[in-house]
Amino acid sequence: MNLDDLLNSALDELETQEKEQPTTTKTTTTTTTTTTSNTTKTINNNNNTVTPSTIKPTYNKPPPPSLGNDDLLNTNVNDMMDIFKKLLGEETLKNLDAGFDKEYNKDINNNSDDSNNGGLPSEEDKKKIDELAEKLATMFGVSEDSDLGDMDNFKPFLEELTKAGGLNFNNDELNNNSNNNNKNNNNSGVHIDNFESSISDTLKNLADNASNKTDNNGGIDDLFSNLSKLMEGQNFNLDGEETGQINDLFEESIQFMAENYPDWIEKNIDHYPPEETERFKNQSEIFSMIAQQKEGEADMLDSGLLARMSQLGNLPDSFCEDSIKKVETEIDEKE
């Protein structure tokens, strides 16, 4: 082994020993720093300089303090307005806030209009319902001593009728009809021409509502339910002649359905799924049961039949249209 090899071997051994030396740890109140002294050894051999590798010190910094979700949320909420004030200015921020409130209230008012009120009666319609209830109470001879009680019994029925789309308020027409009734009949009662006309208009509106398939599908069912409650155990105070005319109109309508509905079902059975045609047949059975009641028992109609009718849902649109056309034709012929 020559001198150069001996020197190189010594340098390698020295470098290995330096790497294995223990590190010195210095502790302060804030940070802990671990360093390894940088040792530089210079050995001159035949004018050659050898410098061992240097180990760089590492610094272990403590992690920043963590904030919980609640702390961050509170910080954001508390500082948000201050940040907006600095960016926009306090006056601009106030104007924006006032503008937001104005637009918000405007949207709320627009959504509360009758057209966007989910089909519910507006405040104006509710007032008209009260007025109509008073007129109906007078027309039907309702008094505090009658079985019907006060006119509040009419209001749920009228409100449901409004929801179903079957009641249009026209004060001029209503007042004219009321005045004509008073002229034609000094006693309290319903003028049959006006009554039939109103029923016809109501049927048309109900059919249109059903054919449009609006979101208020429960409106007609609720209408039947309230009509059932109104009729249950109540005796309308009507003049004998007028009572007979109203009963005749009711019986003719039921008779038409009992006679024509089964044939219509058979002709259109292929146009509907089996579960629908089964529902139609159940409806037809109810109409037949009502039609078979003895004459003079219309005012004692079993409310359970009306409840079952309500549960079975609406009549088919095309059958309703045929029924309405027939009723309108009969009214035109009478006029």
UniProtKB/Swiss-Prot annotation:
Residues 14-70, 104-124 are annotated as: Disordered. The keyword Transmembrane does not apply. InterPro entries: Pex19, Pex19_C_sf. GO terms for cellular component: peroxisomal membrane. Keywords: Peroxisome. It comes from the Eukaryota. Residues 22-55, 109-119 have a biased composition (Low complexity). GO terms for biological process: protein import into peroxisome membrane; protein targeting to peroxisome. It is found in: Peroxisome. GO terms for molecular function: peroxisome membrane targeting sequence binding. Its main location: other. PANTHER family: PEROXISOMAL BIOGENESIS FACTOR 19 (PTHR12774:SF2). This is Putative peroxisomal biogenesis factor 19. It comes from Dictyostelium discoideum.
